[in-house]
């Protein structure tokens, strides 16, 4: 790659044949002075790509956290790797496995006689994985189809539907999200005709032979033992890997357990490393065969590139044959290292640099006709900022502009004139006319669908989207671009998992149109090679159970005679995965015991005495350090320039320099609960590793010292006083300005000079220098004086042979601790997991009067079973208190909005107007009573988190809407994204329907009529505009 600098903002391909180039997308900045021989192509060296289970590899910590541990489930890589090595990317490759229950008369698939005529024919030749899966369907046997996005999994679902209709049977098609259900309804309606749709928002033709519904609707039907379930032959679960979702995955798992054994299943999924484990679970709980058909074949091969921020081009990291380019990765690191060493940018400079990078890459893609392009951003705000950055770019000609206008106007004609004038419509129209789109959850649903339709029609050439666009919707592009490789996970930034990356990058490459798809990642910080391999060349995320108990689940199962809550626990995928892990855990335990037995220490008693002596000394050292670092004792000495040493996560950092001390501010109500050492924050100039940085900022969660031979970064790190382990008697001069890298480096040079001069940094003495008067300190110092000579005189301290024996003793102790932990894990695994929690939750229900002492559901419990869109216990308590009895519709809706609003709360109780404040405080008081009963029942429960889930932010806008306010008016009052308002109001509509049903069960006609009236007032205008897919 050329090193010449340039101000040009355009990218171009290097000259030469694109077809013959191994590194096809070697891209350079246009530089007229660059000589031809300087345009050297990337190295052709290729390393064998790796398909590995993350649990078997020592990878970056962020990946390890998101991977399946061997102790938690059985690795399936041994089933896939040998077969995949050479043929996994060929169209001819399809791996087939089947799990068969005992006593089942199974006929091998190769003896299957195809249906004649088939239930459905196709105008193209089926891929082998499709043909294999269809054989399973024809035999009326369940099948899990695991393949990449756009591989053609829908073919199997269509065949099952055609076969069911041919045999006069009914079939259910479930999807994780409503928008996907709407889109699938449109597709299948045009194909089969006899199709219905059932979601929380709409019900169309519920008597149809093929019903499309969300998983929540299917679960509700199972709870109520709906007659429809006796007529169903097949249930198709689209995007079944969604079962790992921590919030809604449990709904899929519960539904799968409750479905009758006579029903057969089709599971469509992205590639799953533990697909066979999932099939074993299905076979066990439903006593039927379950096939697994797996392919790693991509109809459109994918090439992966990285643009290291600050570079003059992009680098291919993984080619279309899945080969990882090690030499190119080294070049990426060189560029990133050079960029990191440069002067620190101000925030605005960084944004300019990032936006410039994005502009250059998109211009390169457009100039080489590698559009359409999906640009994945990781926040709604970033989507909009990036889209508006291209304000002058126009990608549509006059004819396309006319088409966009026609489709746009036709879509919004159903709306009132006032709603059509909303700011979001005006801004999006301007972008769409120029071929640019935005897609995120803050958009009005009708706008999101409009963008999807225009994108499918080729009228949107650049789409800025959040991650949700990659779920289910069949809308591929030629190129996918990631604005970064990290996402915010609630507390801090983390690397994308390989599964997340695969899901999004899989949108690149349109089958039958593109010869290759391109995935480009903008990288702004260093990443180690193993983590890069796992990201771009790794394995999909393992399907781990997200099963957890809820009161709604327990109460609904109390109503069903055939199955109990205990049965659900026994049959859960969570329990199954843990039980399957037992052989591996026991094998690991045996290995540890053998290793522990093999360690022979001649005089173990003497070694233990030395070890106990060391522990005593460490204990007294910690007591001394705790006294020395107490604010009352150390604050007078914590001046700017003081050399101090900190310890984080058990790691002691090199000496740092104190920059500033700040006293923390606390809520007066919690002040007494905070330890004195936690009341102060220290800003310390520290040498750290480049791996401690995230988005040009220090990331405290990954803070580590420099590695050996690594050039350190010098950054100001904020730590609590508890992190201080040593204070020096030396204080150096500190400059006022410490904003640039150069100023920090200059300041730290003085530390190195002190180290060179003193060899060992002198410590601040607690008695001589600090004059601390403390009986604890005196006693600890005295004991140190007595015990230290014993330590220094011990042969296990002085003699190398004895030190080696002590090292073996430490190793043995560590093994014993592991043996104890694993033995405990085995004991817990062999018991029914979560059974104790179930018993505690049943105790809570009994104390609150939702069931009898014999765990038989009572009237309060039956009312609670009708509520699924809000906290059922709290709502039922409020109903029985008569909370809603005297309320007009606008107050009922406002109160219920506290249960359905899910965005971050920005409203303080102090700022609430009446009557909203009084209503909200009543809700919180009732919630506190439930919290008290839960805690008294010994439920592991965070009262603060529980109370904070009820948010008053949208009470006033909801009340205004019920009283006839326009959508524009409530947008101004709420200051939320339009899409967030619509989403919350639609959840509120569902909750109102459930309140109506609860009132019917209770026999409260007045509350029922109020619920219906409130729903009627809520249900109007743009918030409930029909889907464009219907």
UniProtKB/Swiss-Prot annotation:
ATP binds at residues 147-154. The modification Phosphoserine is found at residue 41. It is found in: Nucleus. One of its GO terms (biological process) is nuclear mRNA surveillance of meiosis-specific transcripts. Residues 16-40 have a biased composition (Basic and acidic residues). A motif (DEVH box) lies at residues 238-241. InterPro entries: DEAD/DEAH_box_helicase_dom (IPR011545), Helicase_ATP-bd (IPR014001), Helicase_C-like (IPR001650), MTR4-like_stalk (IPR048392), MTR4_beta-barrel (IPR025696), P-loop_NTPase (IPR027417), RNA-DNA_Helicase (IPR050699), SKI2-like (IPR016438). It comes from the Eukaryota. Residues 1-15 have a biased composition (Polar residues). It is an enzyme of class 3 (hydrolase). This is Uncharacterized helicase C17H9.02. It comes from Schizosaccharomyces pombe (strain 972 / ATCC 24843).
């Amino acid at each position: 790659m050329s090193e010449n600098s340039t101000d040009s903002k355009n990218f171009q391909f290097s000259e030469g044949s694109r077809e013959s180039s191994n590194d096809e997308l070697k891209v350079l900045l246009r530089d007229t002075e660059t000589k031809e021989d300087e345009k050297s192509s990337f190295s052709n060296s290729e390393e064998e790509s790796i398909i590995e289970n993350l649990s078997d590899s020592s990878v970056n910590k962020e990946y390890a956290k998101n991977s399946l541990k061997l102790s938690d489930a059985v690795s399936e890589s041994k089933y896939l790797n040998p077969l995949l090595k050479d043929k996994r990317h060929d169209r001819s490759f399809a791996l087939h496995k089947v799990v068969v229950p005992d006593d089942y008369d199974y006929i091998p698939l190769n003896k299957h006689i195809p249906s004649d005529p088939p239930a459905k024919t196709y105008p193209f030749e089926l891929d082998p994985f499709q043909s294999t899966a269809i054989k399973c369907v024809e035999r009326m046997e369940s099948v899990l189809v695991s393949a990449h996005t756009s591989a053609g999994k829908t073919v199997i679902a269509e065949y099952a539907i055609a076969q069911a209709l041919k045999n006069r049977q009914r079939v259910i098609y479930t999807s994780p999200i409503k928008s996907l259900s709407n889109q699938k309804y449109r597709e299948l309606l045009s194909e089969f005709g006899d199709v219905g749709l059932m979601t929380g928002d709409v019900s169309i033709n519920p008597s149809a032979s093929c019903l499309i519904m969300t998983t929540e609707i299917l679960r509700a039907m199972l709870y109520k033992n709906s007659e429809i379930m006796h007529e169903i032959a097949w249930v198709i679960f689209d995007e079944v890997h969604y079962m790992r979702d921590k919030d809604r995955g449990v709904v899929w798992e519960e539904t799968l357990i409750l479905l009758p054994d006579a029903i057969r299943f089709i599971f469509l999924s992205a590639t799953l490393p533990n697909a066979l484990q999932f099939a074993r679970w299905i076979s066990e709980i439903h006593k039927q065969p379950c096939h697994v058909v797996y392919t790693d074949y991509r109809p459109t091969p994918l090439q992966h590139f990285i643009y290291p921020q600050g570079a003059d081009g992009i680098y291919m990291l993984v080619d279309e044959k899945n080969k990882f380019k090690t030499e190119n990765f080294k070049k990426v690191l060189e560029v990133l290292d050079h960029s990191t060493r440069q002067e620190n940018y101000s925030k605005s400079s960084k944004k300019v640099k990032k936006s410039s990078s994005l502009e250059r890459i998109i211009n390169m893609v457009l100039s080489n006709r590698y559009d359409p392009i999906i640009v994945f951003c990781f926040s709604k705000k970033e989507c909009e900022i990036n889209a508006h950055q291209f304000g002058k770019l126009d990608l549509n000609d006059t004819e396309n502009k006319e088409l966009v206008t026609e489709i746009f106007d036709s879509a919004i004609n159903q709306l009132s004139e006032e709603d059509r004038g909303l700011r979001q419509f005006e801004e999006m129209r301007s972008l769409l006319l120029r071929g640019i789109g935005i897609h995120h959850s803050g958009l009005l649903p009708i706008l999101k669908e409009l963008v999807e339709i225009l994108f499918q029609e080729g009228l949107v050439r650049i789409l800025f989207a959040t991650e949700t666009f990659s779920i289910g919707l069949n809308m591929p592009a030629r190129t996918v671009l990631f604005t970064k490789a990290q996402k915010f996970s609630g507390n801090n930034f983390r690397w994308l998992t390989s599964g997340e990356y695969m899901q999004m990058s899989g949108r690149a490459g349109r089958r039958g149109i593109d010869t290759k798809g391109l995935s480009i990642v903008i990288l702004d910080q260093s990443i180690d090679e193993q983590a890069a391999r796992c990201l771009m060349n790794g394995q999909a995320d393992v399907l781990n159970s997200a099963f957890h108990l809820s009161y709604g689940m327990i109460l609904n199962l109390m109503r069903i005679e055939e199955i109990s809550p205990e049965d659900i626990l026994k049959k859960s995928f969570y329990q199954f995965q843990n039980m399957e892990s037992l052989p591996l855990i026991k094998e690991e335990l045996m290995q540890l015991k053998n290793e522990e037995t093999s360690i022979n220490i001649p005089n173990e008693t003497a070694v233990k005495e030395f070890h106990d002596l060391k522990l005593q000394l460490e204990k007294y050292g910690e007591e001394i350090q705790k006294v020395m670092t107490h604010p009352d004792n150390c604050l007078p000495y914590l001046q700017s320039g003081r050399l101090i040493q900190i310890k984080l996560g058990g790691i002691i950092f090199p000496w740092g320099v104190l920059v500033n001390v700040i006293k923390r501010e606390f809520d007066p109500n919690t002040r007494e609960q905070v330890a004195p050492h936690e009341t102060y924050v220290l800003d310390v100039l520290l040498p750290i590793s480049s791996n401690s940085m995230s988005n040009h900022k220090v990331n405290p969660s990954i803070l580590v010292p420099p590695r050996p031979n690594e050039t350190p970064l010098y950054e100001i790190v904020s730590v609590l006083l508890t992190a201080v382990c040593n204070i020096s008697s030396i204080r150096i001069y500190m400059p006022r300005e410490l904003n640039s890298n150069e100023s920090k480096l200059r300041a730290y040079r003085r530390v190195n000079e002190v180290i060179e001069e003193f060899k060992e940094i002198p410590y601040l003495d607690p008695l001589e220098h600090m004059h601390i008067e403390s009986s604890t300190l005196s006693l600890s110092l005295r004991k140190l004086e007595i015990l230290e000579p014993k330590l220094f005189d011990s042969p296990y301290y002085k003699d190398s042979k004895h030190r080696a024996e002590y090292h073996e003793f430490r190793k043995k102790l560590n093994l014993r601790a592991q043996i104890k932990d694993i033995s405990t894990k085995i004991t817990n695994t062999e018991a029914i997991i979560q059974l104790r929690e179930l018993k505690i939750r049943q105790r809570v229900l009994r104390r609150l009067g939702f069931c009898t002492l014999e765990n038989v559901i009572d009237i309060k419990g039956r009312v609670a079973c009708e509520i699924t869109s809000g906290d059922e216990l709290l709502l039922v308590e409020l109903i029985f208190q008569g909370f809603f009895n005297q309320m007009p519709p606008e107050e009922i809706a406002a109160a219920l909005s506290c249960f359905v609003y899910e965005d971050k709360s920005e409203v303080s109780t102090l700022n609430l107007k009446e009557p909203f404040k009084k209503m909200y405080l009543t809700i919180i008081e009732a919630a506190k009573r439930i919290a008290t009963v839960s805690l008294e029942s010994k439920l592991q429960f965070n009262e603060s988190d529980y109370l904070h889930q009820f948010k008053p932010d949208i009470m006033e806008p909801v009340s205004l809407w019920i009283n006839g306010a326009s959508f524009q008016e409530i947008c101004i009052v709420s200051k939320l994204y339009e899409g967030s308002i619509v989403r919350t109001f639609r959840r509120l509509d569902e909750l109102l329907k459930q309140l109506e049903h609860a009132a019917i069960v209770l026999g409260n006609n007045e509350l029922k009529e109020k619920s219906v009236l409130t729903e009627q007032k809520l249900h109007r205008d743009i918030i409930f505009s029909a889907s464009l897919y219907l």
